Amino acid sequence: MVFLSWGRPSSEQQQQVINKTGTFNYDNKYRGVSSRSIAKLKEDSEIDKDGFLINHARVLVGSGRESYEKGKKALQNWKHFGMDWAFVDPATPVETGKKFCICVKEVLPWVMLPLQVVYVDESRKSRKGPAHFGYGSGTLQGHLLAGEEKFSIELDGNGEVWYEITSFSKPAHFLSFLGYPYVKLRQKHFARHSSEAVLKHVNAS
């Protein structure tokens, strides 16, 4: 089951997809695992043994509390999907259990990929100290891949603001099996464009 649209998917089309999807399409033991650090993910032999590939990107997008708050707001409003070839409905609330679609333009049709927010994580040690906001989403039945992806923004101890994407995934449909090298290239392409979108938002006046 693949969800396609010849035009830019409407909110109604996305809701129809969400209504048709069932549960997560990957093992329950991996639920929330994307919340771990990239080092711990790479140390987990089970992830590799079960065929998942890890993707990671971390980009400096600014400095100071104001930049961090802008970055946090960008993630809450899905600005990291602010591209002409990929988007999430910006009205989608970032809350645990919320189902949504990532809509991606592929050559001719758009593909609607269903996911569900698995967790939302926020921490702040003090009003002026380090802070972190992020959330992870898991793939649902009907997604071309199986796994999780985390987006996060961090204000570190040096006052620098970092945008980070961490995911582990594997093909969940014969189309993604056949075109997995292309899928991996698209993931890297997305990471670059997403980082540029967050950087643009953080540095906007």
UniProtKB/Swiss-Prot annotation:
Instruction: Name a Pfam family for this protein.
Output: DUF1990
Give an example GO cellular component term for this record.
chloroplast envelope
Similarity comment text for this entry: Belongs to the UPF0548 family.
Descriptive protein name: UPF0548 protein At2g17695
